[in-house]
Every structure is written in C-alpha cells, then in structure tokens.
Amino acid sequence: MPRSQRNDNFIDKTFTVVADILLKVLPTTRREKEAFTYYRDGMSAQAEGEYAEALQNYYEAMRLEVDAYDRSYILYNIGLIHTSNGEHAKALEYYYQALERNPYLPQALNNIAVIYHYRGEQAIESGNSRISNLLFDKAADYWKEAIRLAPTNYIEAQNWLKITNRLEEAI
C-alpha cells in the first residue's frame, strides 16, 4: 500500500486528497502522476524520519520525472536527507544539482551556505583561521544570493553578514 494511503495525520490526509483531485483533473501523463506519487510518498516518509524509505521514493520519482523544475525539488529533498544524516558532501552534490535545474531555489542556496558556515566553524576549532575565512566567504556568497532571491527570509544569515562585515556586497 502506498504511503500516501497510510497517513494518520489530518494534514497529510488532506494534502493527499487535494493532490489526488488535482492529479485527476489536471492534464498530466500517467508517468507524471506516478512520479508525483513517489515524490509525495517520499515527503511523507521524510517527515516521519523514515529516510531510507524517503530516499527510495525520491530515487523512483527521479527515474520517472522528466521536468527539470520538478526534479530540482526532488534533488533538494534528497540533499535535505543527506544533511540530516551528517553527509554534507553528498548533500552539497544534490543541492548543486537542484540549482542546476532551478537556480531560483533560495532554500538550496541557504543550505549550502549553512554547510560552508559549519565547515568554517570546524576549521576554527581546528585552529585553521585561513581556511575558516575562505569557508565563511563561500557561505556569505551563497547567503547573499539566497537573500537576493528571498529578501525577507534568512534574517539570521543577514545579521551574520552584517556582524562579519560581509553584507556590503549583498543585495
């Protein structure tokens, strides 16, 4: 039984019903509908912390989905799972792939920045200030782009950019 039919959560059930109605009335191919079903099931599994199941669904959605824009969100969600699992290098790969297909994905830019910032913090702890500054500069570049796309979001990043004197080139 597909995960979307097992949801106990009212919001998930409502989303599933609305999504099913939209799939029936919108002119989409069987393949597109199937890809969306896998994507939806992946999101549901991911929300419940069932990352292995979510990845299986996302990979199947990727196999079926041909639209670059839709694929960008699948790739982004795969990146989220790898980030949650502490697999930052893998996460970056998926975020970059998502941005190749959809450069207007500020959340991917933000997550890339967060990873570089985290790595910068690790470099400081290791006593490598030169590397940390390079990583912080890289984080700043990604945050600036995310903020350019979504100016009212990422307030903490905006504050960090101001505090570290990296904002002058932003926005």
Curated annotation (Swiss-Prot):
It is found in: Plastid, Chloroplast thylakoid membrane. SUPFAM superfamilies: TPR-like (SSF48452). Disulfide bonds: none annotated. Belongs to the Ycf3 family. GO terms for cellular component: chloroplast thylakoid membrane. This is Photosystem I assembly protein Ycf3. Keywords: Chloroplast, Membrane, Photosynthesis, Plastid, Repeat, Thylakoid, TPR repeat. TPR repeats lie at residues 35-68, 72-105, 120-153. Transmembrane segments: none annotated. SMART domains: TPR (SM00028). The keyword Signal does not apply. Essential for the assembly of the photosystem I (PSI) complex. May act as a chaperone-like factor to guide the assembly of the PSI subunits. Pfam families: TPR_1 (PF00515). It is a peripheral membrane protein.
